[in-house]
Amino acid sequence: MRIAKVRGTVVSTYKEPSLQGVKFLVVQFLDEAGQALQEYEVAADMVGAGVDEWVLISRGSQARHVRDCQERPVDAAVIAIIDTVNVENRSVYDKREHS
Amino acid sequence: MRIAKVRGTVVSTYKEPSLQGVKFLVVQFLDEAGQALQEYEVAADMVGAGVDEWVLISRGSQARHVRDCQERPVDAAVIAIIDTVNVENRSVYDKREHS
Amino acid sequence: MRIAKVRGTVVSTYKEPSLQGVKFLVVQFLDEAGQALQEYEVAADMVGAGVDEWVLISRGSQARHVRDCQERPVDAAVIAIIDTVNVENRSVYDKREHS
Amino acid sequence: MRIAKVRGTVVSTYKEPSLQGVKFLVVQFLDEAGQALQEYEVAADMVGAGVDEWVLISRGSQARHVRDCQERPVDAAVIAIIDTVNVENRSVYDKREHS
Amino acid sequence: MRIAKVRGTVVSTYKEPSLQGVKFLVVQFLDEAGQALQEYEVAADMVGAGVDEWVLISRGSQARHVRDCQERPVDAAVIAIIDTVNVENRSVYDKREHS
């Protein structure tokens, strides 16, 4: 999985029928120190993440093991909203300090 | 998924039998600000996107969860025609301004 | 999928039993203008493409949806021999001009 | 698979229900000489690896063939804790020298 | 698939139970001219390749279609030991000249 930050949304009315009701978020990947990378993805969000929240993104066919996405053509999904990231016993991110 | 712009078509008569009737589009990936990237893909299109339209592309085995593609060897598909893209509450793209 | 040009062959006698009879082609990926990229792949060929022909390559688990490859450990396959490639209403490639 | 070193943890309370009880590790990929690469991944850990241990990471849909992960949306998992790495008959890593 | 050269081994005692008896090889990818690339992978080997042999590597979920790997979390596998590689009717590699 990858760590990412929610940056925006994509809206589409004309789409695969199975995608009705699926929310699409624009997410930007972060490195292990929390620095933004020049890498973006559009991910299906069934967890309910908000802009600026840190999330875990799962990609490829595994993305469909998110609730209600089994038969949907999504190749990236938000699987968790991150509380904390620790690297070498140092806190890189703590959600409480960002709310 | 990735944001892309439709740029052209690929036509093939001599192909896997299961691909009869599948339309192939040449798409160019865009970054989150709508700038063209030097990355192209050929995607199966069951949604009916036109040249210059912004679309969402799903890749890998998930591409086959598009209608009628279950048993087809496609690894990239158009899953939606994009209406709007918003990043940090700023409109990056609105289809109505491009029609 | 990706556009590629057939460049050569790989032969192997000592291999997974399920691969008996599968032909392996060395293909070089092309960009949307038909320029050769420094990216190669070895693809299973059930379509019968020849050296210098332009082909469509499908990669990942989708490659096995090519005829007779369901249970074979191939992660790249030729799915079509290309007739034409058009980008922004300009012909990039036409097979008849290359035969 | 890829060789990696465990560098930290990610904790999330608000996540896909199927992910309850799954431990997430931040791992950094290493090259064949054991040098750290600027590539990070978050992997599910069902093996019980500790910080600084060298591990084998499997990615993509194969990651779910780890115990208890069949229906979980994980796209990267720790599949083994490495004892030794040898390249060209030279020892690159031996766990006993690092405990 | 990718062409690679066997460079070494990884040994692990503490691993996913399903991986008992699986041999892990360190392989280095080669370009179409046989030049070594700075890209390494650890692949499961059910074919019995030796150090310095040229092999074909299949990656992603297709790797599990190698014998006895159906339910194993391997995302890369040796599927063939290469006899010859020809590019543009020129011999790039012939196993007999290397034994």
From Swiss-Prot, chains A, B, C, D, E:
InterPro entries: CcmL, EutN_CcmL, EutN_CcmL_sf. GO terms for cellular component: carboxysome. SUPFAM superfamilies: EutN/CcmL-like (SSF159133). Heterologous expression of 12 carboxysomal genes in E.coli (ccaA, ccmK2, ccmK3, ccmK4, ccmL, ccmM, ccmN, ccmO, ccmP, rbcL, rbcS, rbcX) leads to the formation of bodies that resemble carboxysomes, have densely packed paracrystalline arrays and RuBisCO activity. These structures open the door to generating carboxysomes in plant cells to increase their photosynthesis and productivity, as well as tailoring bacterial microcompartments to specific metabolic needs and molecule delivery. It comes from the Bacteria. Keywords: Bacterial microcompartment, Carbon dioxide fixation, Carboxysome, Photosynthesis. GO terms for molecular function: structural constituent of carboxysome shell. Induction: Carboxysome size and components vary with growth conditions. When grown in ambient air at medium light (50 uE meter(-2) second(-1)) there are 7.4 units of this protein per carboxysome, the numbers are stable under low light, and increase under high light and high CO(2) (at protein level). It is found in: Carboxysome. Disruption phenotype: An insertion in this gene leads to rod-shaped carboxysomes and an inability to grow in normal air, called a high-CO(2) requiring phenotype, HCR. When ccmL-ccmM-ccmN-ccmO are deleted no carboxysomes form, cells are HCR and RuBisCO is soluble. Both mutants grow on 2% CO(2). Residues 1-83 form the BMV domain. GO terms for biological process: carbon fixation; photosynthesis. Probably forms vertices in the carboxysome, a polyhedral inclusion where RuBisCO (ribulose bisphosphate carboxylase, rbcL-rbcS) is sequestered. Has been modeled to induce curvature upon insertion into an otherwise flat hexagonal molecular layer of CcmK subunits. Beta-carboxysome assembly initiates when soluble RuBisCO is condensed into a liquid matrix in a pre-carboxysome by the RbcS-like domains of probably both CcmM58 and CcmM35. CcmN interacts with the N-terminus of CcmM58, and then recruits the CcmK2 major shell protein via CcmN's encapsulation peptide. Shell formation requires CcmK proteins and CcmO. CcmL caps the otherwise elongated carboxysome. Once fully encapsulated carboxysomes are formed, they migrate within the cell probably via interactions with the cytoskeleton. The tight homopentamer forms a pore with an opening of about 5 Angstroms in diameter which opens into a wider tunnel at the base of the truncated pyramid. The pore is positively charged. Belongs to the CcmL/EutN family. CcmL subfamily. HAMAP family: CcmL. Homopentamer. Interacts with full-length CcmM. This is Carboxysome shell vertex protein CcmL. The lineage of its organism: Bacteria, Bacillati, Cyanobacteriota, Cyanophyceae, Synechococcales.
